[in-house]
């Protein structure tokens, strides 16, 4: 029999299982065929908080709101609590935040004969978002200025790194020395770079990760766009004589340094700052950003065709413990069991009168329809291969559900995607209940609530984890396997998981591909192996992103994407940086040799009880893509 309500082995049980027939005793304990069981550690929503978004004058397209006080308290003081964040848009569609994205721009610039005249340098700018497809971040309303200016000290900032030498002879040497000071290593035995005592180390608390929890943020912003991709023109960082970058956060750092053992050696400056995400003039001479030869910079993000209007936070009873998850408090601790048209009591809890909400896993291609008690929310994408299918500029659409609960995808240019949803079930006092054994289901006058297609999430089995760390070099477009998590997933069915991306340190900034490595290190000079990342000191900031994901069997779910642009730049026609930056194929030549790339991390339900992790590289006009894995501890536990 597929349904039981009563007592077995002297304990109260309500149980719904797949199949029909069989011994009543199979309901005593839940197993892999269980749909609902009153003894299971079900995942529920204990609190719901909502606020509308507004758009201030001068805020561009940065919609924002202060977070409710309870959400602010959880965000800053309870970083292990799994809180789901839903964004509702002007057309009624909905999206649940998941994953992370970065935008990276990098440039090396100089002239064909740097021993004679002009400038040289290198520069990187990084933005990041607390969602794979949408630009989302946190800030403090107490910061001065407009909303974009407030983001200089929030997670919506741009992190700016640069090394620069002015109009003087032998600028080439200064470029090399500046690169050595800014990055962790320089060429080995190349004859160009020597060890230098002047180095720039960025303190960890200068960095604003999208999952940062220690800065007292009390507000959130959302754009109807993807995370910024930074497109560079030809000029270089323009430092002021006062030793600070104009328009940047006061928390920035700027070092003017040189080789102290040789005062006559070429001088150079090395800098870091956080800045407004919408105004990049402070490190560039401004002009037409669409002029590839002389334009200073472009800020490009893909509009998804919708505008955010409301945010809802769902506080769950799931708590991350560093190696897995716990359920906070018991759900059903009484004895009474009753299921009748007007009453639904599970071990003393009358669910019709509770404020709890259950979270259901919905099978792929199943739609509950437009119902008052179900609120489906698009949570993640999936596809048949770990590849964007796009060379260079790839953008993932936004998984949403429409106001009638139908799944959809907004914007993007990556094809072959499926939108997956999580379903929020709200018990209504007006519900009239029924139960069926064949097929097994519990429902009410609004429709089925729990069935083989509608599984209430519950914490199952042990957790699994892997750490994504190290260097990878791609010689062309392709995907590589970077990790496996064993979870004892049911091999024949789709599943749902809870997943935490815990960033062990701030080397995630170096995960931005070639844009985050020293551009004066050519591939032929050993850049395949050299550790040439930014120096970040300390790890004082808690950085976690929690999400619930749907994993269709055999499909790949993107959870972290990096969009990059690199430019080999010079202001003079028919001149180029010398030597050639390591990402460029060939000798110096044309102005503005620009390359584009997208790095994407996927997880796959392998159908053999494992989840595999993949990294895909998509490049255009780039050779030798060098990537640093972001030093993420990825913790996953089954919910179905």
Curated annotation (Swiss-Prot):
- Annotated region Interaction with host FhuA: where? 571-580
Record site: Interaction with host FhuA receptor: 166
Q: Which GO terms describe its cellular component?
A: virus tail
One biological-process term from Gene Ontology?
entry receptor-mediated virion attachment to host cell
Q: In terms of domain of life, where is this protein from?
A: Viruses
Q: Which UniProt keywords apply?
A: Host-virus interaction, Late protein, Viral attachment to host cell, Viral attachment to host entry receptor, Viral tail protein, Virion, Virus entry into host cell
Determine if Protein biosynthesis is one of this entry's keywords: no
As for subcellular location, the record says: Virion
Does this UniProt record's set of keywords contain Thylakoid?
A: no
Extra remark beyond the main annotation: Only small regions of the protein may be involved in protein-protein interactions in the tail structure, the major part being used in receptor binding.
Record note on quaternary structure: Monomer. Interacts with straight fiber protein pb4. Interacts with the host FhuA receptor; this interaction is necessary for the entry of the viral genome into the host cell.
As for what it does, the entry says: Structural component of the distal part of the tail. Mediates T5 irreversible binding to its host entry receptor, the E.coli outer membrane ferrichrome transporter FhuA protein. Upon binding to host FhuA, pb5 undergoes conformational changes that are probably the key to the transmission of the signal through the tail to the capsid, triggering DNA release.
User: Per its record, how is this protein called by name?
Assistant: Receptor-binding protein pb5
Q: Which organism is it from?
A: Escherichia phage T5
């Amino acid at each position: 029999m597929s349904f039981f309500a009563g007592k077995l082995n002297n304990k109260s049980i309500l149980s719904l299982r797949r199949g029909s027939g069989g011994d009543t005793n199979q309901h005593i304990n839940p197993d892999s065929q269980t749909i609902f069981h009153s003894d299971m550690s079900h995942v529920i929503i204990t609190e719901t908080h909502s606020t509308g978004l507004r758009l201030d004058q001068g805020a561009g397209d940065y919609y924002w709101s202060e977070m409710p006080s309870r959400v602010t308290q959880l965000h800053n003081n309870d970083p292990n609590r799994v809180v789901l964040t839903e964004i509702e848009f002007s057309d009624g569609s909905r999206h649940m935040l998941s994953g992370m994205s970065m935008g990276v721009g990098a440039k090396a610039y100089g002239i064909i004969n740097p021993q004679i005249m002009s400038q040289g340098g290198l520069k990187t700018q990084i933005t990041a978002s607390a969602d794979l497809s949408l630009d989302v971040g946190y800030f403090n309303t107490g910061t001065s200025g407009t909303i974009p200016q407030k983001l200089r000290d929030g997670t919506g900032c741009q992190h700016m790194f640069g090394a620069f030498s002015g109009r003087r002879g032998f600028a080439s040497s200064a470029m090399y020395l500046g690169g050595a000071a800014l990055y962790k290593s320089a060429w080995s035995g190349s004859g160009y770079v020597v060890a230098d005592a002047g180095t720039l180390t960025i303190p960890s608390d200068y960095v604003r990760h999208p999952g940062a929890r220690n800065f007292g943020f009390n507000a959130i912003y959302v754009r109807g766009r993807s995370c910024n991709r930074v497109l560079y023109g030809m000029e270089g960082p323009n430092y002021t004589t006062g030793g600070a970058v104009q328009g940047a956060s006061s928390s920035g750092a700027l070092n003017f340094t040189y080789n102290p053992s040789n005062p006559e050696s070429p001088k150079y400056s090395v800098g870091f700052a956080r800045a407004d995400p919408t105004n990049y003039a402070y490190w560039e001479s401004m002009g037409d950003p669409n002029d590839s030869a002389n334009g200073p910079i472009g800020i490009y993000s893909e509009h998804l065709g919708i505008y955010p209007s409301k945010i809802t936070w769902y506080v769950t009873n799931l708590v991350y413990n560093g190696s897995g998850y716990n359920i906070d408090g018991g759900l059903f601790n009484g004895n009474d069991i009753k299921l009748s048209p007007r009453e639904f009591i599970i071990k003393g809890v009358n669910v019709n009168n509770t404020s709890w909400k259950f979270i259901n896993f919905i099978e792929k291609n199943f739609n509950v329809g437009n119902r008052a008690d179900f609120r489906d929310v698009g949570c993640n994408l999936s596809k048949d291969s770990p590849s964007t299918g796009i060379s260079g500029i790839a953008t993932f659409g936004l998984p949403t559900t429409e106001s009638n609960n139908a799944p959809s995808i907004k914007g993007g240019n990556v094809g072959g995607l499926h939108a997956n949803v999580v379903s929020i079930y709200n018990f209504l006092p007006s519900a009239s209940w029924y139960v069926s054994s064949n097929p097994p289901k519990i429902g009410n006058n609004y429709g089925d609530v729990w069935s083989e297609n509608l599984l209430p999430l519950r914490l199952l089995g042990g957790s699994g984890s892997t750490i994504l760390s190290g260097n990878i070099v791609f010689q062309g477009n392709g995907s590589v396997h970077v990790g496996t998590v064993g979870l004892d997933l049911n091999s024949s069915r789709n599943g749902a998981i809870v997943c935490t991306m815990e960033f062990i340190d701030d080397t995630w900034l170096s995960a931005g591909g070639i844009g985050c490595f020293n551009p004066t290190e050519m591939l032929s000079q050993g850049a395949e192996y050299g550790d040439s990342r930014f120096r970040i000191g300390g790890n004082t900031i808690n950085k976690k992103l929690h999400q619930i994901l749907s994993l269709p069997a055999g499909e790949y779910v993107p959870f972290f994407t990096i969009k990059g642009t690199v430019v080999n730049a010079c202001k003079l026609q028919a001149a180029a940086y010398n030597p050639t930056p390591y990402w460029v194929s060939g000798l110096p030549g044309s102005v503005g040799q620009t390359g584009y790339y997208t790095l994407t991390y996927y997880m796959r339900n392998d159908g053999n009880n494992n989840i595999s992790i993949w990294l895909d590289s998509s490049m255009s006009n780039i050779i030798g893509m060098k990537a640093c894995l972001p030093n993420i501890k990825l913790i996953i536990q089954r919910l179905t």
